[in-house]
A protein has these predicted regions:
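A compositional/biophysical signature of low hydrophobicity enriched in polar/charged and small residues
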Residues: 1-77
Length: 77
């Protein structure tokens, strides 16, 4: 799982949103306020993720956090 914060380099929001919505691997696609313009949660493979990021970089800048392990413990053990 990848968590992507995306920062637009232009105001072509509608075209960018159409681009992102082409990908079935994207589970969450939110327009946000704060540091980033959008927050995405995706499930690309190690092979397809670099291809997506290369295309994404045509639209702006991004930062990526990759899911490693769920550490939430509600004491149910």
């Amino acid at each position: 799982t990848q968590y992507i914060r995306f920062f637009m380099d232009s105001n072509r929001y509608t075209a960018f949103e159409a681009f992102v919505n082409q990908y079935k691997e994207i589970e969450v696609f939110h327009k946000v306020s704060g540091q980033a313009c959008y927050l995405l949660v995706s499930h690309f493979t190690d092979v397809t993720f670099p291809l997506f990021i290369e295309s994404l970089s045509n639209w702006g800048r991004y930062s990526v956090e990759t899911f490693v392990a769920d550490k939430l413990n509600h004491g149910d053990d």
